Regions:
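The feature captures the beta-strand-to-loop junction immediately N-terminal to the Walker
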Residues: 41-43
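Conserved ABC ATPase "signature" region
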Residues: 119-137
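Conserved catalytic motifs of ABC-family nucleotide-binding domains
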Residues: 163
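Helix-to-loop junction immediately C-terminal to a conserved catalytic motif
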Residues: 56
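Catalytic Walker B motif of ABC-type/P-loop ATPase nucleotide-binding domains
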Residues: 167-170
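Conserved ABC ATPase signature
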Residues: 142-146, 150
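ABC ATPase NBD Q-loop/coupling interface
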Residues: 16, 65-82
Length: 191
């Protein structure tokens, strides 16, 4: 079986050529296969968030490659948007991803940018909301009025609604109580 995603000798250095130059990730390599759960563990400041921002092209490597289905995601920089639809990323802090006036509109943003409309769009939004435990009566609320755990669910639903092949989660259960963590992880496994 071929890996869906490959990280090959990834290095990321911030502020190259300045007195503030600092390597956040050095010579990292791993493969991700269909259906696989992969956890990346490390201390605060060890480069985990920097690493995952490379997986869908939010950051460009200083050296090394990210391959999606065997193809370097940066081989055609104009197509990086397509990579972001295939590799969905949920940030550690969901408020970085939320900006619409309602939960529904926030979840719908990605699918709309994929060209989905009408019933197809509504189905994507409602199914993603259901998967993460967002009730229909919450869809008309402002995402900014929600608790931290609920904001995290909205951010996750917004990414899941795009139906990415790879789902990358930065601290997915932070802010959730034990029952919420268990429920969310079960729903992600079913995804």
């Amino acid at each position: 079986m071929e890996p869906i995603l490959q990280v090959q000798h990834l290095t990321h250095t911030y502020s190259v050529g300045t007195p503030f130059q600092r390597s956040a990730v050095e010579d990292m390599s791993f493969d991700v296969y269909d259906g696989e759960f992969l956890g990346i563990i490390g201390h605060t400041g060890s480069g985990k968030s920097t690493l995952i921002q490379h997986l869908n092209g939010l950051l460009r490597p200083t050296s090394g490659q990210i391959l999606l289905h065997g193809k370097d995601i940066w081989a055609e920089p104009k197509k990086i948007r397509d990579v972001r639809f295939q590799v969905g990323l949920v940030f550690q802090y969901p408020e970085y991803q939320l900006f619409e006036e309602t939960v529904y509109k926030d979840i719908a943003f990605g699918p709309i940018n994929q060209g989905k409309t009408g019933e197809e769009l509504d189905r994507c939004v409602r199914e993603a909301a259901r998967l993460v435990g967002i009730r229909d009566d919450q869809l008309d609320k402002s995402p900014f009025e929600l608790s931290g755990g609920q904001k995290r669910r909205v951010a996750l639903a917004g990414v899941m609604a795009m139906d990415p092949q790879v789902l990358v989660l930065d601290e997915p259960t932070a802010g959730l109580d034990p029952a919420g963590r268990e429920n969310l992880m079960a729903n992600i496994r079913d995804y």
